[in-house]
C-alpha cells in the first residue's frame, strides 16, 4: 500500500513539473493547425472563385483561347492549394511527432529496469539545466549541453531562441520584431488581454517625440490609439501631453516617459507574456525543484550563528546554498528525528541518545566507537568525561 502511495505521489509530482514539457509542443501543434486551416480555407476560396468564373464563361459559348486561359488559372490555384496543404500537413506532422517523442520519454520513468530509470533521471536533470540556462540567457551553453546529451527534441530551445531575437531587438530599441511576434500570436494575446502591442505603440510615439518628429507622432497616435479605452485611454492622454514639452524636459511624468529604461520594462513585459502564452512559470523547473528540496531539509540548526550545529553533509549548511535557502520555509516534520553529530546515524531504540555532562547529545554507538580507557572526548568542546557519566535521554 505504501509503495503504491509513493508511486502515486511521484506520478503527481512528475505531472506538475513536466507540464511545460508537453504543453509547449502541444501549443505549437495547435498554432500550426489553426494556421493550416486558414491557409487551406483561403486557397480553397481562390479555387472556388476561378472555377465559378470558368463556369460562367462556359455558359456564354466562349472562344477556345479564353477557356484555356481560365483552365490554366484553375490548375495554378489547385497547385497552390496542393502545395499549401502539403506544407501544412508536414508542419503538423513534425509537431505531432515531437509531442509523441516527449510522451514516450516521460513514460520511461516508470520502467522496471533500474538502469533505464537512472538514464532517464540523468536526461531529466540535463533538460532542467538546459531550460534554466536558456532562461538565464546562456543560449550557446544550453544548445551545446542539449546536443551533447541528445535531448534537443526534449527541450524548448526554438521557443527561447525566438524570444532571444525579440529581446535583442528591444535592447537595440527596435519594435518591428516584437510587433511581428505580436501579430503571429494575435488571437491568443487578445484572449490573454495582453497590453504588449499597445505598450510598443506607446514607445514608438515616445521615440518620435524624442526625435522631435511631432507631426509624425500625431499621425501615429491617430492610427494606433483611436481604439484605446479604459486604462489605455488614460495612458494615451498622458503621452499626448508630451507634444507640448521639449524632449529634454525635466517635468514629471514626461521625464520618466522619456527614460530609456522603459525599453527594459518592455523586455520584461514581453518575457512575461511569452511565458503566459506557453503557460510557463516565471521560474524554471530547476529553480522550483531546488527550492523544494532545500526547503524539505532546512532546519533552524542550519542557521545557528556559532556554526557548531552545521552538518557538513547537509546541502543547506553549505556556503553556496545556505544563503539561497534563507528566504525559504523550514521543513515540515510531524515527527522529529534525532541524528548523531558524530556518525550521522539516526538515534533510536537501537542507538539511544546519550547526554554528556556538558549537555551535548550523541548516539550510544558513536560514544562506544570513540571510547578510550573508559573515557570519551566531546567532539565539540574537547572536554573529557567518563563513559559512565553519559546519561540516556528520553523524548516524551
UniProtKB/Swiss-Prot annotation:
The reactions it catalyses are: S-ubiquitinyl-[E2 ubiquitin-conjugating enzyme]-L-cysteine + [acceptor protein]-L-lysine = [E2 ubiquitin-conjugating enzyme]-L-cysteine + N(6)-ubiquitinyl-[acceptor protein]-L-lysine
For this protein, what is the EC number? 2.3.2.27
**First and last residues of each zinc finger (RING-Gid-type):** 314-381
Say if the entry is tagged with keyword Ribonucleoprotein: no
Matching entries from InterPro entries are given as:
CRA_dom, CTLH/CRA, CTLH_C, Fyv10_fam, LisH, ZF_RING_GID
Cite the LisH domain residue spans from the record.
Answer: 121-153
Please name the GO terms of the biological process aspect recorded for this protein, alphabetically: cell division; erythrocyte maturation; proteasome-mediated ubiquitin-dependent protein catabolic process
Question: What's in the keyword line of the UniProt record?
Answer: Actin-binding, Cell cycle, Cell division, Cell membrane, Cytoplasm, Cytoskeleton, Erythrocyte maturation, Membrane, Metal-binding, Nucleus, Transferase, Ubl conjugation pathway, Zinc, Zinc-finger
Q: Site (Essential for ubiquitin ligase activity): give the residues.
A: 314
Question: Per its UniProt record, what PROSITE patterns does this chain match?
Answer: CTLH (PS50897), LISH (PS50896), ZF_RING_GID (PS51867)
Q: SMART domains recorded for this chain? A: CRA, CTLH, LisH
Annotated GO molecular function terms are: actin binding; ubiquitin protein ligase activity; zinc ion binding
Superkingdom classification of source: Eukaryota
UniProt-listed SUPFAM superfamilies: RING/U-box (SSF57850)
Keyword Membrane among record annotations: yes
For this record, an example GO cellular component is:
cytoplasm
Task: Summarize the protein's role.
Answer: Core component of the CTLH E3 ubiquitin-protein ligase complex that selectively accepts ubiquitin from UBE2H and mediates ubiquitination and subsequent proteasomal degradation of the transcription factor HBP1. MAEA and RMND5A are both required for catalytic activity of the CTLH E3 ubiquitin-protein ligase complex. MAEA is required for normal cell proliferation. The CTLH E3 ubiquitin-protein ligase complex is not required for the degradation of enzymes involved in gluconeogenesis, such as FBP1. Plays a role in erythroblast maturation and in the development of mature macrophages.
Subunit and partners = Identified in the CTLH complex that contains at least MAEA, RMND5A, GID8, WDR26, and RANBP9 and/or RANBP10 as the catalytic core. Interacts with F-actin.
Recorded hits in PANTHER family, A to Z, give: E3 UBIQUITIN-PROTEIN TRANSFERASE MAEA, MACROPHAGE ERYTHROBLAST ATTACHER-RELATED
User: What information about domains appears in the record's comments?
Assistant: The expected RING-type zinc finger domain is highly divergent and most of the expected Cys residues are not conserved. Still, the protein is required for CTLH complex E3 ubiquitin-protein transferase activity. In addition, the conserved Cys-314 in this highly divergent region is required for ubiquitination by the yeast GID complex, suggesting a direct role in catalyzing ubiquitination.
Could you identify this protein by its name?
E3 ubiquitin-protein transferase MAEA
Amino acid at each position: 500500500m505504501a509503495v503504491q502511495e509513493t508511486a502515486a505521489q511521484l506520478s503527481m509530482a512528475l505531472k506538475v513539473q513536466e507540464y511545460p514539457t508537453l504543453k509547449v509542443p502541444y501549443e505549437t501543434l495547435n498554432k500550426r493547425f489553426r494556421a493550416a486551416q486558414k491557409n487551406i480555407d483561403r486557397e480553397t476560396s481562390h479555387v472556388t472563385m476561378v472555377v465559378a468564373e470558368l463556369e460562367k464563361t462556359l455558359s456564354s459559348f466562349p472562344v477556345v483561347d479564353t477557356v484555356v486561359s481560365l483552365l490554366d488559372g484553375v490548375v495554378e490555384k489547385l497547385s497552390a492549394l496542393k502545395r499549401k496543404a502539403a506544407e501544412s500537413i508536414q508542419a503538423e506532422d513534425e509537431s505531432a511527432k515531437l509531442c509523441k517523442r516527449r510522451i514516450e520519454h516521460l513514460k520511461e520513468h516508470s520502467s522496471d529496469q533500474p538502469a533505464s530509470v537512472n538514464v532517464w533521471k540523468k536526461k531529466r536533470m540535463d533538460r532542467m539545466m538546459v531550460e534554466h540556462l536558456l532562461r538565464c540567457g546562456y543560449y550557446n551553453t544550453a544548445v551545446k549541453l542539449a546536443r551533447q546529451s541528445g535531448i534537443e527534441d526534449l527541450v524548448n530551445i526554438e521557443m527561447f531562441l525566438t524570444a532571444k531575437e525579440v529581446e535583442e531587438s528591444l535592447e537595440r530599441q527596435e519594435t518591428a520584431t516584437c510587433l511581428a511576434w505580436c501579430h503571429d500570436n494575435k488571437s491568443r494575446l487578445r484572449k490573454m488581454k495582453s497590453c504588449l502591442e499597445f505598450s510598443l505603440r506607446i514607445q514608438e510615439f515616445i521615440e518620435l517625440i524624442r526625435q522631435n518628429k511631432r507631426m509624425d507622432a500625431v499621425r501615429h497616435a491617430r492610427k494606433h490609439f483611436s481604439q484605446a479605452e479604459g486604462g489605455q485611454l488614460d495612458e494615451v492622454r498622458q503621452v499626448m501631453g508630451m507634444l507640448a514639452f521639449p524632449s529634454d524636459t525635466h517635468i514629471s511624468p514626461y521625464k520618466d516617459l522619456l527614460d530609456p529604461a522603459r525599453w527594459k520594462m518592455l523586455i520584461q513585459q514581453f518575457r512575461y507574456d511569452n511565458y503566459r502564452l506557453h503557460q510557463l512559470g516565471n521560474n524554471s523547473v530547476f529553480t522550483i525543484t531546488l527550492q523544494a528540496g532545500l526547503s524539505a531539509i532546512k532546519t533552524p540548526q542550519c542557521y545557528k550563528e556559532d556554526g557548531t550545529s552545521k552538518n557538513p553533509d547537509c546541502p543547506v549548511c553549505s556556503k553556496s546554498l545556505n544563503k539561497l535557502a534563507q528566504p525559504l520555509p523550514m521543513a515540515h516534520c510531524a515527527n522529529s528525528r534525532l541524528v548523531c553529530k558524530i556518525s550521522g546515524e539516526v538515534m533510536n531504540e537501537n542507538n539511544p541518545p546519550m547526554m554528556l555532562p556538558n549537555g551535548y547529545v550523541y548516539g550510544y554507538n558513536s560514544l562506544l566507537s570513540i571510547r578510550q580507557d573508559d573515557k570519551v572526548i566531546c567532539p565539540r568542546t574537547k572536554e573529557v568525561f567518563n563513559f559512565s557519566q553519559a546519561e540516556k535521554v528520553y523524548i516524551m
